[in-house]
Amino acid sequence: MANVELSEGTIQVRGQSLFFREARPGNGQAVRFSVLLLHGIRFSSETWQNLGTLHRLAEAGYRAVAIDLPGLGRSKEAAAPAPIGELAPGSFLAAVVDALELGSLVVISPSLSGMYALPFLVAPESQLRGYVPVAPICTDKINAADYARVKTPTLIVYGDQDPMGSSSFQHLKQLPNHRVLVMEGAGHPCYLDKPDEWHTGLLDFLQELA
């Protein structure tokens, strides 16, 4: 098993302290690129640690960073830049990326985190290498023209038992460069219901971006 280096810490973003967990390849192994993992309202960076996603990504050669979003997890004291369900400024996630020095990256965005990732995705200056939405909210708040301009390779993931996954897909399918992974028998946090299928699909997608 490949050696993996684990760490955690905080970054300052617009005067707010945000907690993060990180896993990267050990033994001085070169990093392919960075993957930023966001989370839903009932979850946190700990979800990705416990599921093994951080470890699996680092084993495969990626720098994996999971943050606790403002007001949640160990970032509970941080004020969110927008009310839940409203689009946050794209510059907020850009500031997170800068503070973590992630460079060209892939963003994994389940559920609640759509309010942060979608504005970042459609920003003209976006440096996203790849986008992995998992039944995110706010997909109806992006217009068709903005979706059509996005060239970022996208893996749309959702469980077939999740109505939000189906409804968000109706908007996300407007992204020109997308593929779809539907997990049979899985609900809203489909990655928890089908972790092996999640990790296989994610790693296959990332491999093609290298």
Swiss-Prot record:
Coiled coil: none
Enzymatic class: transferase
Residue numbers bearing the Phosphoserine modification: S91
UniProt keywords, alphabetically: Acyltransferase, Cytoplasm, Nucleus, Phosphoprotein, Transferase
Recorded GO CC terms: cytoplasm; cytosol; nucleolus; nucleoplasm; nucleus
Principal subcellular localization: cytoplasm
Active-site residues (renumbered): S111 (charge relay system), D162 (charge relay system), H188 (charge relay system)
UniProt catalytic activity: L-lysyl-[protein] + acetyl-CoA = N(6)-acetyl-L-lysyl-[protein] + CoA + H(+)
Cross-referenced Gene3D superfamilies: alpha/beta hydrolase (3.40.50.1820)
Example GO biological process: positive regulation of transcription by RNA polymerase II
A GO term for molecular function: protein-lysine-acetyltransferase activity
EC number in record: 2.3.1.-
SUPFAM superfamilies: alpha/beta-Hydrolases (SSF53474)
Superkingdom of origin organism: Eukaryota
Record note on quaternary structure: May interact with TAF1.
Biological role stated in the UniProt entry: Acts as an atypical protein-lysine deacetylase in vitro. Catalyzes the deacetylation of lysine residues using CoA as substrate, generating acetyl-CoA and the free amine of protein-lysine residues. Additional experiments are however required to confirm the protein-lysine deacetylase activity in vivo. Has hydrolase activity towards various surrogate p-nitrophenyl (pNp) substrates, such as pNp-butyrate, pNp-acetate and pNp-octanoate in vitro, with a strong preference for pNp-acetate. May activate transcription.
Family from the record: Belongs to the AB hydrolase superfamily. ABHD14 family.
Protein name as annotated: Putative protein-lysine deacylase ABHD14B
Taxon lineage: Eukaryota, Metazoa, Chordata, Craniata, Vertebrata
Gene name linked to the record: Abhd14b
